[in-house]
Amino acid sequence: MHGKSLGSSRKNDSRSKIRQEKESNIDFDEKHDEYLINLQQRNRALNNSKAKDATQIKLQHLEEGFSLYLNGANADLRKQQSTQDLARESSKSSKIPDDGCSHLPGRRSQTAPGKIQRKAWVQNSIQIKSERGSRVYIGPNTKYSEDFESDDDMNEDQASDQYKYFTDSEKNVPQGPGKKRLVLDASDVKALRESLEISLCLQQDSKYSLDDDDADFVEEELIECETPELDSPSKTQLESKHQAFGHQRLLPGDFVVLEFNALDKKDGRMLTAKRKDNSEFYIPTKPVMVKNKTPRLKSSSFSSKDSFFPRPESRQEILLPTPRRSISENKDSRPSVSTVVDAINNENEAITRAISDGKTEKMTSGPSGISEGVVTKAIEKINLMKISQQKKLLKVLQDIDNDSSTNSNSEGEILKWDSVYLDPAVKDVICITVEILSNWGNQYYIGLTEIQFFDLKNEEIYVSPHDVDIRNVDVPGDPTCLVNGKTLTTKEHFMWTCPFHPPVQLYFIIRNATKSGDFDISKMKIWNYNKALSDLDIGAKLVKIYKDETLVFDGLLAKGSGNQDFDYSNTIDLHSGQIKSSSFISDQFSDETQISNSLGASNNIELKHQSDGLVYTSEQLSSILSEGSNQAKTSQQKDLHFENNTKGLRTFQDEALNKSFQHLALTSSSINCQEDITEGEVGIKMSYNKEEHFKINQSKDFNTMTAELQMVSATSSKEPPPCPRDDNDLTVTDQLERTPGRKECSSLNRFPPWLSSSSNFQQKSHNQPTKNHLNASSSTFTNKRSDQDINQFLDEYVKSSNTYSNKNFKNCSQSKMLCSSSKMDNEDDLENFSNQSSYNSDRPVSGRRKTVQMQDKSEKYEGASFHKTINPVDTKNLRPRWQNDQENNLLESWTSLIKFNKSHRGRISNLEFEGDIFDEFLQQQQKAGKQSDSTKNGSSLMPKGATEIHLESEKEEGSNFEIPVLPYGQHLCIKIVTTWGDRHYVGLNGIEVFASTGKPVEISRIRADPPDINILPAYGKDPRVVVNLIDGVNRTQDDMHLWLAPFSPGKLHFINLDFVEPCRVAMIRIWNYNKSRIHSFRGVKEVEIFLDNELIFKGEIAKASGTLSGAAEQFGDTILFTTDDEILQAMSLFDETFSEELKATETPTEHEIDSLRPSTADSIKEERPFTQAGLSEKLQSNLTDVSENYSDKLPGIYSGKCLLLNFTMTWGDPHYLGLTGMEIVGRDGKALAITLDALSACPQDLSILPEYKDDLRTLDKLIDGVNITNEDTHMWLIPFASGADHTITINFNKSEDIAGIRFWNYNKSPEDTYRGAKIVYVTLDGHAISPPGGFLIRKGPGNCHFDFAQEILFVDYIHEQQILEKQLRSHSKCMELATMDYEAPLMPCGFIFQLQLITSWGDPYYIGLNGLEM
């Protein structure tokens, strides 16, 4: 019985185990299915994450086909397929049953290689022992697929084997149902090739115009686009094939068969066997077969072995799985393909018709023959192919059509189409390189003033300073000076200089900002170095100019003028390579031809009339200047152009030149004319060899020589001196006289050359009637100017020269020489040089010089002659008188300048031309207008010089705008035009406006457009807002008090200020942006200020220095609208800068010095001298007396019983607020006694929180006296909530006088100091005594190395300024001002040195230092 029960129990146990095993198997299968589903989803997500964008796909295309060691040492050792292998493979491919599997819509693609074993994936059979004791063998599934999708095609291996390559032996086998063949002859091949070239060019051009929305067209094309594929060969096979029949030529009887695949075949994405990220795309190929009826081509090397292209065995055709993302059929992967195909079809139809009309009868050898539309059909098939396949086909067609002439024509046509379609239509940049090879004599430096570029429309091209580079130099200087727009200037900081080590290269990048199609540079202008006459040798001389690495100019540049009145530019035509130097005085006159004819007729000198001057031949000029010359000997006839830097220089006849040089050299001085011929540029240097004791520097008195040559030439040719032929010859003085505010220069050292050139002329006007002189002049020269105009001109000139009428003839001649800064040691030479036209008698000379007889036999001006003999005795006193006159004139000029500076300088709105871009614009406009007028009127209107244009523009500008006196209004608008160089930001430190009462104007509202940089996406809470401009803190570099806004050149930038009430504005002070020396270039430069829409100022604001030192002029500009002394005196009382300057200039009197001197010990008094660094008892007693006398009137001291402190902000901690200690400062500066009963807080401490019941940081720690500590047991801490009140209330027993509060902020550690209080509001008996923004409490240091107490005195926030307050504040101990009532110890020794920083340079909240040295 017992055995039966045991047996039944065992059966039940076995049954339960079997049931459990079945259930576990079911659970395992379910879990396994869930695992497979999850794994499949993960694989799909991984594939989606590996999807590539268009850029990655393009890179993938570029990286395809590369393999390592392609041409290595073992490249030829690979196994070569034999003929048996080829036959075996061809027979195997022919035995494949055509069961229709190949015609399925899509074939299953295996995405993972089967031979690669996954890591940690067990594929071998395993043996598992079950619970019943039996052994179970489990093996992997042989049909496992990685993507776990259903296997719809069980015959994919057989189907994949079907796609094999066919040899040439199969060309006669009937083509399958999915194949399409076209037979072309030679003419068809040529037409197809030409059409395909055009098609590819069009498609390549359309590729550039695709939108960003279609960036994924490559992926879509590879997956969905159903295209017929031409079986084109690979690259290496094409090369071998090309070598096979490269020496042959396609004859008219030869045919080419194009075979296309089925239309329903889709592109499959080929994944390589290796696990790579960059997959390759497989394109099945077939060879292009050439049929020929003649046996010649069959016996050639183009055999079946050469034409067979075996598929690489390492690559297997593995297609993507059938399920793909659905893409709309109507969405083409390339939107422009359809339009391009239509255009190509239309064009090809026309080409096909043209070819078919002129084509002879063709021979047909294919199974279906050749029809007239075979080319059209081929093009339709080819258009459906991919671009890469079309390119391969084009290469094959070019190889087949091997005619040399055809190939050359096709290549030329391809280049033509590439230039039309593929090259960019717009040229973006042009690179200009200016290579400086030499200068005008300076051994150390090279310099230029300005370089400008002009386009084909003769408009100036803007060049950014960032696009200028100086190369081949160690110290490049400031390249921005080359493109700063300062052309006519003598200021050195506007010019570019650097150490000269030739060659120096200036590199410019000229950008096509307008994106115009005809962008090019027609010419460029170069202004040479122009600081002063003595520094003109720094200017560049021999230069080479390269345009995009092509030499376009090689020649000389003219020197500068040494002044800012004349245009000294060099215009270089980059197309012709010619240079034209601007003269100082225009030399293009209407009567130039007549002068040249009259001068050339008498001397047989060939004069060529050109647009830029008169031309001599070298042989004739050398004969003129051969006397005394050692170098001017040439035998060839060369054209020598007199190119110089003055506008008065002209070529003269040989007699005039000979006599002028005789006058210059006097007796035996030799003249050398050195010719510098450099590639069409010929410069003539004239140097004077001093035989005795004088030498003339040609670079300095070149202008004077020019004027003298003119005078001598006219005199020696028996003609009276000519009158000016246009406005620019002698009317420069007239211009100066008619210009307001322009005074006549009386300094002989700076005497203008145009005045010196007419000194003799002026003297003659006193010695003979003016009318006769004018008649003689007008009879000689055919001048367009009337006699009446000349009379008027001379009358004005004589009136303007009355200052010099009382001087003798010698002084006039001396001043003429001084204008060119030349120093003569012999006064006889000076006399002869200046008075050459006045004497016809022999001049006595001293020394070894011989007398020179004047060639003039008659010097009569309509019956009036000059005969004056100079006594040699008169020349003895010449130098003393010359020195006295020079000193007197210099003193007069200096005195005049000082008077002008005192009386008129502050009243001129536009003092100088430099720096005003609006004046430059007006000058250019006036130049253009006057040039156009002169062109219309012909030769009757002469072009005006640069000086007259400058003076007239200055006059017009000055007359159009004047600074008003005390303008009245309420709305002030500041328009910012430019900055000091920054192209992105503009900023200011502050704006101050003072009324006519002397007080600052109260501003109700300020706004700006753009408001600040917070409008930019990268900014959001930047403190540099526009309100900071009127916060009163101007001399600072703190961002909390600056204003910064985005700046866009050419756009409008405004700052608008609204006054509380209308007033008369007396002064506006603008504090420019002063963040640092670099950031100071963000400051405003040119501004226009409007008051109630009335312009009250237009000009330039000085750039800030970027430092905190210096006077107010170092931080901006002050604009005065009045010179009334009473208003200025009233403004000085409220102007902080004036008080600071006054303090800096104050010097203590002797009594003050004695009272500040510390007392010392003597034998009379027994008291010990006071040596402690503090206040003496005498000063303390005086302070006590003063305090008692003025106790009721002291500002900043408040009386009350209930003091309330409200803390509203911490230094960053959002949860806790704390203090270390606190004291209430009384009247005498001592702390008031506070008991714990009088002290209360809300919240009390941390005990209100459940977890801080027994916390020691309670309220009584504030008054325990332990303040300099890091222990939080002596600190007070409470919970903090932003926006809530956190108060401390102190109730005194009686009314107390309170002067301030002393705080020790929370100081547990540097990290915990952010819990310290930051803002506190103080009220006494309900009355607020703190400013509207509260008191700012300094953050604790986090250590206890020093006393970090902060004393807040109410008196510091009182704005009343009275003398009594200043005295009390100066003696107050709390201010801790320096005093001399102590003796400094000698070499103090200690561990801790304490520096008490009393004040900052304007910042009320922060103070700092850069460093300390001891």
Curated annotation (Swiss-Prot):
The keyword Cytoplasm applies. Residues 10-32, 86-101 have a biased composition (Basic and acidic residues). Residues 147-158 have a biased composition (Acidic residues). The keyword Cytoplasm applies. Pfam families: DUF4457. It comes from the Eukaryota. One of its GO terms (cellular component) is cell projection. Keywords: Cell projection, Cytoplasm, Cytoskeleton. Residues 832-843, 924-940 have a biased composition (Polar residues). It is found in: Cytoplasm, Cytoskeleton, Cilium axoneme; Cytoplasm, Cytoskeleton, Cilium basal body; Cytoplasm, Cytoskeleton. InterPro entries: KATNIP (IPR026704), KATNIP_dom (IPR027859). Residues 1-32, 80-116, 139-158, 712-731, 756-783, 823-861, 924-943 are annotated as: Disordered. PANTHER family: KATANIN-INTERACTING PROTEIN. May control cilium integrity. This is Protein KATNIP homolog.
